[in-house]
Curated annotation (Swiss-Prot):
It comes from Clostridium perfringens (strain SM101 / Type A). Belongs to the glycosyl hydrolase 13 family. GlgB subfamily. GO terms for biological process: glycogen biosynthetic process. One of its GO terms (molecular function) is hydrolase activity, hydrolyzing O-glycosyl compounds. SMART domains: Aamy. It catalyses: Transfers a segment of a (1->4)-alpha-D-glucan chain to a primary hydroxy group in a similar glucan chain. It comes from the Bacteria. This is 1,4-alpha-glucan branching enzyme GlgB 2. The active site is at residues 337, 390. Monomer. Keywords: Carbohydrate metabolism, Glycogen biosynthesis, Glycogen metabolism, Glycosyltransferase, Transferase.
């Protein structure tokens, strides 16, 4: 393979390259480094391809300019077109093919930041030209325009070293994790228009601190053509979306969150990409980033194309992209979207529309290997960054380590729990006793994976109704049901995720084209009280380690009564690491008050109320114990030697502990 000097057709040129944040100093690329970089890229082992692929401002032979490099294995010719040459195909801007595996490169002097450009790629036969944005561009035009924009990864003064050091040393399994999922374009707006990353930081950080969430999860922030895709059908995997600003704007937001002890997760989509003609689709007129076989490449259900996860150069593209967000933007983890679509060859396909693997099964062996390698890389190089799988099936070993034969994710969304419990709370309480298993079944498999309990954006859109509107009954019953559901969720083992707007009971579904209905908090007392309830519940969660310190250990949870279907009541104990930290949850899913309700308790002593979802301050009717003390008796009940009798609020949760 040619070295970097041959790549420029210069024997003695001095190459300096300013890439990423290197304290503002130029870095000289040696012959060995350049050879290693391209070899690893072509082998599917490169984890920082963005440092040499794409467009980089460098000095070559004492001339300042931009080095363009791309991968296009079947192209017969590639021109760089842009503002600087009137978008014309000129021979002097024809890229040089530097190896037979499809690496193309060209240095153009005297280019400045802000110049728009594309690659004009002629196909293998030379009879068709496609105009493509740069897959590795750091900036793209604001939609509907589609060109890439020359920009530098400028130095940024981070102030989150303490946060990152703590992240690397401490895991999250035995820590609180209460995630606020949000879409940056519709959380809040300014005069109906998008806010910048910096403007968002001024209000979001204070709101998250006020509400007591530990993490935020951003829906995708890479460039995407269609607002309605929410970022999940991407084009510019390395471009921070121009809707809200630039790279340093996003870094400012993340830095401020970290300095206020708030973690940042990012939704990431290595499964599929959009078919817009300026993007990755048929990059050189033939399958490049997608599978060669059309049935495997085409994702008809989503109108997208699936990445070829077995192709080395595509793997380098995606591995590098994952590390780009972790290294350059300090994100604390990636929530990997649509994992089921990756794992199954027959996902979304009917009989006859797919072919089995070499073992006659439906598992995508290339995707399985890709995910294992991805998680291994992040565990090794991510300095404590985590990965979360959005996976909706019963595939085994999602969060089991790669060494033990698993995929190696840190956490998995518990879609089963979400589907079961949401279908239950929509039922009239008269019929709930016939579906009691929907609320207790999750504990049958709870310790098979490390789960996050998600109420995500997908559940409050496209006719599914807002979370408050999923609740049964009139307005009072809906808000009581919401408080009950949220407290049951907080008591259930597993980390938590709640989508924006649910925390104040927004009635309308989420709409990506407008901000949340913040005005209702001021206009209607029940919305204000609902927000205060979530704030208090989050605080209660943070202050009680029994709710998170043993999420993934069986000794952290014990049923008091899992089978009271007739009265639709669930009662259980959450236990902390020191075993003395115990909280008793009694959840009543009917609108009836239960007087002198008997439950078994683990020890003889005095029990006091520490949380009640029916408090007047939260919009309830006030069926609370207050300062009353309940003395346990030696009368056994169920599997316990002792018992107490309590008043359980309607559509409410009562939480007790030993005084």
């Amino acid at each position: 393979m040619r070295n970097y000097k041959e790549l420029k057709h210069e024997k003695n040129g001095n190459v300096t390259e300013k890439i990423g944040e290197n304290k503002g100093k130029s870095k000289k690329m040696s012959k060995d480094e350049s050879l290693l970089s391209f070899d690893l890229f072509l082998e599917g082992k490169e984890h920082s391809a963005y440092k040499f692929m794409g467009a980089h401002f460098i000095t070559e032979n004492r001339k300042r300019g931009v080095r363009f490099t791309t991968w296009s294995p079947r192209a017969s010719k590639i021109y760089i077109i842009g503002d600087f040459n009137n978008w014309e195909l000129k021979e002097e801007y024809s890229m040089k093919k530097i190896n037979e595996r499809g690496i193309w490169s060209l240095f153009i002097p005297k280019l400045e930041e802000g110049i728009k450009y594309k690659f004009a790629v002629e196909n293998e036969c030379g009879n068709n030209t496609v105009y493509k944005s740069d897959p590795y561009a750091f900036k793209s035009e604001l939609r509907p325009n589609t060109a890439s924009v020359l920009t530098k990864i400028k130095s940024f003064r981070w102030g989150d070293k303490r946060w990152l050091n703590k992240r690397e040393k401490e895991g999250l399994d035995n820590k609180p994790m209460n995630i606020y999922e949000l879409h940056l374009g519709s959380w809040k707006r300014k005069d109906g228009e998008f806010m910048t990353y910096e403007e968002i930081s001024e209000v979001l950080v204070e709101y998250i601190k006020e509400m007591g969430y530990t993490h935020v999860e951003f829906m995708p922030v890479n460039e995407h053509p269609l607002d309605a895709s929410w970022g999940y059908q991407g084009v510019g995997y390395y471009s921070v979306t121009s809707r809200y600003g630039d790279l340093n704007g996003l870094k400012t937001l993340i830095n401020k969150l970290h300095k206020n002890n708030i973690g940042v997760l990012l939704d990431w989509v290595p499964s599929h990409f959009c078919k817009d003609e300026h993007g990755l689709f048929m990059f050189d007129g033939s399958p490049t980033y997608e599978y060669e076989v059309w049935w495997k490449a085409n994702n008809e259900g989503w109108g997208t194309c699936n990445f070829d996860l077995g192709r080395p150069e595509v793997k380098s593209f995606l591995f590098s992209n994952a590390m780009y967000w972790i290294n350059e933007f300090h994100v604390d983890g990636l929530r990997v979207d649509a994992v089921s679509n990756m794992l199954y060859l027959d996902y979304g396909r009917e009989y006859g529309e797919w072919e089995p693997n070499i073992y006659g099964e439906n598992g995508n062996l290339e995707a399985i290997a890709f995910l294992k390698e991805l998680n291994t890389i992040i565990k090794k190089e991510g300095k404590g960054a985590i990965t979360v799988a959005e996976e909706s099936t019963s595939w085994e070993g999602i969060t089991k380590s790669v060494e033990e034969g698993g995929l190696g994710f840190d956490y998995k969304w518990n879609m089963g729990w979400m589907n079961d419990t949401l279908s239950y709370i929509e039922l009239d309480p008269i019929y709930r006793k016939y579906h009691h298993n929907k609320m207790n079944f999750s504990m049958m498999y709870n310790y098979s994976e490390k789960f996050i309990l998600p109420i995500s954006h997908d559940e409050v859109v496209h006719g599914k109704k807002s979370l408050i509107n999923k609740m049964w009954g009139d307005d009072w019953k809906k808000y009581a049901g919401l408080r009950l559901y949220a407290s049951f969720m907080m008591g259930h083992p597993g980390k938590k995720l709640m989508f924006m707007g649910c925390e104040f009971g927004q009635f309308v579904e989420w709409r990506e084209w407008e901000e949340l209905q913040w005005s209702v908090i001021e206009e209607f007392d029940i919305h204000r009280k609902t927000k205060e309830y979530f704030k208090a519940l989050n605080k209660f969660y943070l202050e009680n380690s029994s709710l998170w310190s043993l999420d993934y250990e069986e000794e952290g949870f014990k049923w008091m009564d899992a089978d009271n279907s007739e009265e639709s009541v669930l009662s259980f104990i959450r236990i902390g690491k020191n075993k003395k930290e115990k909280l008793i949850f009694i959840c009543n899913f009917t609108p009836e008050v239960y007087y002198d309700f008997k439950v078994g308790v683990p020890e003889l002593g005095e029990y006091v109320e520490v949380f009640n979802s029916d408090s007047l301050e939260f919009g309830g009717v006030g069926n609370i114990m207050g300062d009353s003390i309940l003395k346990a008796t030696e009368e056994s009940f169920k599997d316990f030697d002792y018992s107490i009798s309590v008043k359980v609020p309607p559509l409410g949760t009562l939480v007790l502990k030993v005084k």
